[in-house]
């Protein structure tokens, strides 16, 4: 590279140190400032660079490490040369008392000349209120101020367009922006610290949507790290790891859905959820292609909601999305963030709600992501007894740090408000609540009161739920909580965690355990299939048959069942109909609706080819009918959370492997559910019924169209008050189909 022109010293002025062309000495302090600037350790580069009024005029200093020459271009077209001072810093005086609008004309050794705006002439893009709220950990719209935001500023020389980069790194010794725009060399783009709030900021003109970027962070430990933006709105597709500048331009069309949602009480509405892993439902589809195919499929099957396994960006596909590195960016595997908005919008327009799995319990150790972000344990807890998850070898958030809690609460709001998500299923809540979760004695630290409860996590969950419900009426916050923690779905003002629903893991484990026994032996395990009603109203429950039950050697739902192919299918049909009639909402993982034989594989996807076989096509037909009948039968959902919605008829027939109960609607409607988990039919069984008159069978899982044997009720069922039975004023003789479930409704006198 050709040497830059020497700085001339005016005649007659003694200057023992290097001088600029105006004769002002290059003091040791100024040299040290420039050295710190180039080294990336200057906390306020804007104090040195940019335009600053002085006695001689307006000083303009520019950092252009690779430039041959730099001139200031003024609004009147004149140019003022900025001589090179030291290590790529150019400086000179522009006549006048006030800072003018200007641009920099930068020439390089190859003759290239560029006219660019100066990043260091711009004021901070964060206001005092934003800084205060960040410092307090109370900025509920954190994504509006952190991350990368494209901006436009008017000026005499023409509007300036660029991107404001803002990142929280309170212990960093310096932060620079790197990306496509500077050939991934951050020397020319050091950021300024905004003080004790810990935020670093820089507006870079000329950087727009689609630009890849990262932060170079000089940690408190003296180590430079290249970090993805924790609040990036878009990313490169894995395995690449850069963040991407993205501005949403999506126009939503779901106002009607949002209005109805805000007025609804999901506890008193039908809610059947189809759980989906987007990458393997039909492998190879984009968000927009899924919007065409998935929407039609879910509507055909009649589910009220879908629940997506985590969509936030994650580097390892085999984690299924549960090891998140970019909490504010939908994965780039299937398209842009606006493409994902389109998928949600299409589902809403079809009357289908959207839940997301959300993972605040832990995050991976990837060195380019959140781990030791500023050279310290920033997002993670510094004590490994609280900061490392022993099951997954991941890091645990420091819930006691207000800024970290703010990051997570704002992230939940981001998905709910920016993507119109209808609720979040919070993953691994139990691992957050207990300090000794998966830890042996001596591997965990008690709380301040000597207990094992994680008090910081409890406070975080309460804040999360209270804030989410306050800002977004009609949503659902759902806990995957596998213990008997009290009050998970109780309101925060009465001491609860504030969730709207909780997965009923006990029902799932007990029911699957019962059904895996041969029918001959089920009589000895009858309590497993009845115990759920002992605590059914202790929380607001979702009954989950989720992805977790069909992986890691647990076998598919179909192959958990005993017997030959017909018996397995019959058992599974009975399970689903029993589940849909049991108090609580329902969740079914994709593939289970067609009785998939293999365990789920995120690489292979759903075994759609099985639908050519009658048993599998019949299972899908049954699920569609279950959802149709469920939505149209108030007794199955309007009193899910109160004991008045359920009455046992007979829960004690262990030897016959049968159950019978009533479900009541808030309008007085009633449904009788007859369950037979034995392999033989039970004809001419007397069952108690609340009303005398005609009863009609609306569902029989043993029907031929579902793949059953065709054992059904003998036409219209006449209930009579001549023989009160099972605590009911009337009764009738009915048939319990083999390995089947029958639903009866009152048809009138």
Curated annotation (Swiss-Prot):
Pathway: Glycan biosynthesis; glycogen biosynthesis. Keywords: Carbohydrate metabolism, Glycogen biosynthesis, Glycogen metabolism, Glycosyltransferase, Transferase. It catalyses: Transfers a segment of a (1->4)-alpha-D-glucan chain to a primary hydroxy group in a similar glucan chain. Its EC number is 2.4.1.18. GO terms for cellular component: cytosol. One of its GO terms (biological process) is glycogen biosynthetic process. Pfam families: Alpha-amylase, Alpha-amylase_C, CBM_48, GlgB_N. NCBIfam families: branching_enzym, PRK05402.1, PRK12313.1. PANTHER family: 1,4-ALPHA-GLUCAN-BRANCHING ENZYME. Belongs to the glycosyl hydrolase 13 family. GlgB subfamily. Monomer. Catalyzes the formation of the alpha-1,6-glucosidic linkages in glycogen by scission of a 1,4-alpha-linked oligosaccharide from growing alpha-1,4-glucan chains and the subsequent attachment of the oligosaccharide to the alpha-1,6 position. This is 1,4-alpha-glucan branching enzyme GlgB. It comes from Thermobifida fusca (strain YX). The gene is glgB.
